[in-house]
Amino acid sequence: MRTSFVVGATLLGLACGGGKATRSGASDQTPQWLADGTGAIRGEGGKRLQGVGVASAVADPKARRRQADAAAREQLQTAVDALALALAKMSESTQPNLAPTTTGIARKAAGQVAAIRDHWVTPDGDERALAVVELDALRRALQAGDGDDRIRGEMAANVERAFDRVAER
């Protein structure tokens, strides 16, 4: 009877112990995206813009996650803005104040395809979030989006070159 209880308690403990979002703080388990940081990233799955956000000193896990997600989206926005600026510099358009136009078009297109991809919680309770825009998805969103057709088409055609310029920095 005592053995059955010990075995049952052990099995119950093992069954209930999984599924945590928290990972060890050991450097070999730190996600690669955390080391890559925010910006234009060339990865195994292709080219992408990513933002890494951090939430610290938030006791409530749901609030911490929302804060990390918001910070990641904000960081992603800086990467999208850098790409839009590179696209504006490459443009052949003679339209005055082209940078705000390209930034608006790029932000809208990126907003349609951006996604929070991952989270990582450190042993001390800080949470990191990863927001991503895949370059191919951004190109398709630029082609199908709103705004001046000629500028959108030019942006979609030059997005690869602009990405390469931003990634060099």
What residue ranges belong to the model's regions?
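Sec-dependent bacterial lipoprotein signal peptides
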Residues: 1-15
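Domain-level marker for long, solvent-exposed, non-transmembrane regions
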Residues: 16-169
